Swiss-Prot record:
UniProt-annotated site: Increases nucleophilicity of active site Cys, residues: 437
Catalytic reaction annotation: cob(II)yrinate + 2 L-glutamine + 2 ATP + 2 H2O = cob(II)yrinate a,c diamide + 2 L-glutamate + 2 ADP + 2 phosphate + 2 H(+)
PANTHER family: COBYRINATE A,C-DIAMIDE SYNTHASE
Record-given protein name: Cobyrinate a,c-diamide synthase
Family note: Belongs to the CobB/CbiA family.
Keywords, ordered alphabetically: ATP-binding, Cobalamin biosynthesis, Glutamine amidotransferase, Ligase, Magnesium, Nucleotide-binding
Gene3D superfamilies found in the cross-reference section: 3.40.50.880, P-loop containing nucleotide triphosphate hydrolases (3.40.50.300)
Sequence ranges assigned to domain GATase cobBQ-type in this UniProt record: 254-445
Annotated catalytic residues: 335 (nucleophile)
Listed EC numbers: 6.3.5.11
Length: 458
């Protein structure tokens, strides 16, 4: 065990609610600092997959999810400190509102809780469109609600004019006693959204231009030097964790990971955990015609409904995956991966044939079918968990499955929805397909068990 007292310049960019401009400010700040020569390590509070993709493109470093519902305090500190190595400053993007939590009463799962675990100063982004004095009341409420949160300033977004900006700035600084660190005009830039949130970074061909444009806006309208000063004054962190050695035998196990514009929802920490014990081989579901020589397969979530026609057309790979599953090789699929392993996927464009291994069809709906954190209990041993093991994760999808035959389930739903409101995790041969997204740092035995199952098939 090692005690690591570390001075890590860090700041949380939080929001008064969703869609107030947190992502724009965060990635603009990241990109601007990179352009100035800083090595920026990005983080995302919460379970989101899409924002970290933008973080990666803005900084060149993989973003890490810090979620206090799924992860313990020690796990959050471990991934935060371990992945900061080699960086100059940490920019931590929040989620929803600063104090929004998993149960709306405690601070569990909130940005505020994570900021306190990290002893990180907070800069709040607020939408002040059509507000002046009321903005001060809102900001004062955030300041007083939890004195242990290190609220160091606010960025006022979507102001209508210079006159409006002056009024709101004066009100917030005089009446709320919070320093204004930026005033951003409305309609400067608009981030593209889809039903799960932002459109993925994979789908933007103009990403460099977009990121540089956002960085210019941040540079012009935000006091970046002051934010850096706030980050540099963050108190030291003490964290205790073990330095784990990679398995020297990992070269004998290969895990295929389908990672492309279709299936891009992977926690980087999950891939890192697997890579401690196995070699990862990446597969493209649209362009690769054959599976590489691997011992197991991991299919994450994403947007198969957007690329359903392309998935259907790649019949050779679908057949390869079917045969791989049928042969009893370990296959773990989450959400979009579950949909892909089913028989078909129905969208507004029609019904498309999928791999056809699992006995279900899925259909897309305009409204979400499940959203939020999930807690499961394992009903029977599977490739990622032993019997009666607690599994924590989250769900967010607009699809609904229909079973087409008898299904064996791995998990009982204690919180969440799963496949039918009571169960999740269809088991067939050595394949597990579920709606829940699991962070492997919530229980490190998950990755180890999956790799051991792959080793047994060799």
């Amino acid at each position: 065990m090692k005690l690591l007292p570390m001075d890590i310049p860090r700041v949380v960019i939080a929001g008064t609610s969703s869609k107030v401009g947190k992502t724009m400010i965060s990635i603009g700040l990241m990109r601007l600092l990179v352009n100035r020569g800083y090595e920026v390590q990005p983080y995302k509070v919460g379970p989101d997959f899409i924002d970290p993709g933008f973080h990666h493109l803005a900084t060149g470093r993989y973003s890490r999810n810090l979620d206090s519902f799924m992860l313990s305090r020690s796990a959050i500190l471990e991934t935060f400190i371990r992945n900061f190595r080699g960086a100059d400053v940490a920019i931590i993007e929040g989620k929803t509102g600063l104090y929004d939590s998993s149960d709306a009463v405690s601070e569990k799962g909130s940005v505020a809780e994570v900021s306190k675990i990290l002893k990180a100063p907070v800069v709040l982004v607020a939408n002040v469109e059509r507000l002046n004095r009321t903005a001060a009341a809102i900001i004062l409420g955030y300041k007083l609600f939890d004195p242990d949160v290190l609220l160091k300033g606010v960025i006022l977004n979507r102001v209508g004019s210079e006159r409006h900006a002056g009024k709101v700035r004066t009100a917030v600084e005089k009446l709320a006693g919070v320093r204004v660190l930026g005033v951003v005009p409305r309609k400067k830039v608009k981030m593209p959204y889809r039903h799960l949130g932002l459109v993925t970074a994979y789908e933007r061909e103009d990403m460099d231009e977009l990121l540089d444009n956002i960085a210019e806006i941040v540079e012009k309208h935000v006091d970046v030097d002051k934010i850096l000063e706030i980050a540099e004054k963050a108190p030291p962190l003490d964290s205790v964790f073990e330095d784990e050695k990679e398995d020297e035998e990992k070269k004998y196990v290969k895990i295929g990971v389908i990672r492309d514009q279709v299936f891009s929802f992977y926690y980087q920490d999950n891939l890192d955990e697997l890579s401690k014990y196995a070699e990862l081989v990446f597969v493209n579901s649209l362009t690769d015609k054959r599976l590489p020589d691997v011992d197991a397969l991991y299919i994450g979530g994403g947007f198969p409904e957007v690329f359903a026609e392309g998935l259907e057309k790649n019949e050779k790979l679908r057949n390869e995956i079917y045969d791989f599953c049928q042969s009893g090789n370990p296959v773990y699929a989450e959400c979009g991966g579950l949909m892909y392993l089913g028989e078909s996927l129905e969208t507004s464009e029609g019904e498309f044939e999928m791999v056809g291994f699992l006995p279900l069809k899925t259909k897309m709906y305009e409204r979400f079918q499940a959203q939020g954190y999930s807690v499961y209990r394992t009903l029977k041993p599977c490739i990622i968990a032993k019997r009666n093991q607690k599994i924590v994760g989250h769900e967010f999808h607009y699809s609904r499955p229909t079973l087409t035959g008898k299904a064996d389930f791995a998990f009982r739903v204690e919180r969440g929805f799963g496949i039918d409101g009571r169960r999740d995790g269809i088991l067939k041969e050595n394949t597990l397909g579920c709606y829940i997204h699991v962070h492997f740092l919530s229980d490190k035995s998950i990755a180890r068990r999956f790799v051991k199952k792959a080793m047994k098939k060799k």
